[in-house]
């Protein structure tokens, strides 16, 4: 598609994604869901803490009400909170304004349908046609113009649902959380407070510009120091819209999404709560995770990269747990998309039930050394088809002699090619990755 990628419509604010785009998305969505149901559409809208999110919210809501929809504003909330409230409140559509882990200058618009799933591609194609002027929708007039509703109660209900999902106490547990100066800043602490934890929060003072800046799940160093210096039991880091979660164990070591899948998968399987004894990682997950799951008596079925593809594979096979190394973890029995705060609660459930530290729980998961890089390119398709790049990939694979692997793929949200190499030792992984990266950088 032209505008919508694997994680919505994303771009630099007022460059790749403009207020005109936001207004037109609102116009089409407001009309589409009303016309198809012969009544006013009800659309719920959330945003992250970027300066531009407020601008895009105003444009989007203007478009919605101009087409006759009632717009319910959740204000700042994690992306999974929008999906949760779309379903709980029986809304026709949910819209989140966020560029997730990207820098503050970027932004994005994600849409979910009434079931809380990411919007069907056929609807997104209709929106793109309207943006490009290939179709028209009428303006509402008179009493058909929509209303704007301050819906802070929806955010409060989302927080209450997170608390209610935890049937355990965290009394006496010292937990560090890094809110990335994003959507988790006003949501995560109340959840852990309600469960009795001793919570030490960092990076929860958003100013519109500091979202994801040297903090959160893409910059774990400060949380690692925080856990060690404060003598905490565990730490959790979210990204800008809090749909991802990575952890830090009591020794200050990062626990990535693959390790979280392992810990939760083994625990759920032990208690008969893992459907089919199967976990759904992605093709980019560490091969060591697959082998470790097999040694623990579990199966793995891989999906494409992106939580949309993970959940599609989970639905297809009736599986209940899946996720990505980056920290998107989906617990299919209670949610339809990655939820960073929910993930941290599920990890705490395992720690409390098993009476083990996070380092003890992750110890059996033996990951292979990896090397990763994202290389900016002008044309992603042309880059992958380039003969020099193809030769570099073949040479890198040959250098690993069947004891590792390389994965080279297009990003679904940025103009980059992502290169991943795995090998028995770090030096071999680094060498394979650098060989391919050099070929891409030479284009």
How does the language model describe each region?
Residues 45-48, 177-179, 249, 333, ...:
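Short glycine-centered, acidic/aromatic-flanked micro-motifs in structured strand/loop junctions
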Residues 234, 271-443:
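Phosphate-binding and adjacent anionic-ligand microenvironments
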Residues 4-5, 45, 71-75, 96-97, ...:
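General beta-strand structural signal in soluble alpha/beta enzymes
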Residues 1-62, 66-67, 148-175:
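An N-terminal, well-structured beta->alpha segment
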Residues 31, 42-106, 190-248:
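N-terminal small/polar loop signature for handling phosphorylated ligands or for N-terminal nucleophile
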Residues 125-159, 164, 250-323, 330-331:
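Proline/glycine-rich low-complexity loops and linkers
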Residues 12, 107-230:
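Gly/Ser/Thr-enriched, mixed-charge loops and adjacent short helices
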